[in-house]
Amino acid sequence: MTHPEQLGKLFVPDGIVKRVGGMTEALLVFVTRLRSSDEVDENYTRITEFVIVGFPSLQPEYFQLVAWFFFLFYVTTVVGNLLLVMVFAWEHSLQKPMYIIMVSLALSDIGFTTVAVPKLIARYWWNDGSLGFHTCLLQEHMIHYFGSLNSLILLSMALDRYLAICFPFRYPILMTNQTMTGLTLSCWVVAHIFPGIATIGFATMPFCGPNQIIHAFCETMSLTPLVCGDTSKQLGAAYAGAMFILYVPLAFIIISYICIIISILRMANGQGRIKTFSTCATQGCIISIYYIPRFFVYSTPFFPNLKMTPDIRIATTLFYSLLPSLINPFIYCLRTNEIKMILRRWVQRKKCITPIK
């Protein structure tokens, strides 16, 4: 029988984060070496590695339970999103603009989960929360990159639904597969801008202790307290970038859905109205889960009376970061008739092949 730790290492290699993005990490090393030696007081020792603490109040007897929870969460998320990608790749009938967005979102969810979760599992399974300095900065960049990417993908999804519902006759001309592919590729590139600026800023700043990160992974708000010296400019720039990449798309999403709701209410066909509204409600649920908790967390620094304990803050961050990645493929598979029909046909085909064998 396979021991739990062996099973964990089979699916979640301890150094998975350290193997991601060698070129990016090399760039971070180069940028870090540009720091002048007078930035750090000689009395300080420069940090070479960080330690992920996770939930600071969690008792050791619950470590294995938490590790198992995140391990099962990770496997389920990756398998569910990979299934969605495979269905799209094998079924030519699904190669439409709407499904191109779904696949892009699925790949983004796989990327974010793979960057964020394995080290958290290692922290509680093998009590190994250490990350090299540049590996931590790389993780910080990728965490915010995939968060920004998801925001842009949700904007693209809202734009697609807006054109499909408000301009149904012009939609096939306005939104072709080539147009949507170019739009999604642009999202994957543009999403690097603000996280890249923040990461380069951190790479040029002095970290001189302590090195414990009170969070589930390396990210801007958890790294800032570890910087020596004044961080107001960097923190202000990071907040400005986060607000822009999150809430500018959200504003356009809200406007597009207001237009969609108006168009739905004008529909003469009651059955078509219900079907269209159901599709939009599904996407609205995903958007709400993604944005509302983020707004709550990012707003706390501006309200001194609104305080969150580290455990609640970490739990809230994990909720809005990881839950959409888990439920997205299941919601779209269960609520999209074309995907349900294809999965049903696969199952029936499997049942027919098995007796023949």
Which residues does each predicted region cover?
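Transmembrane helical core of 7TM receptor-like proteins
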Residues: 1-357
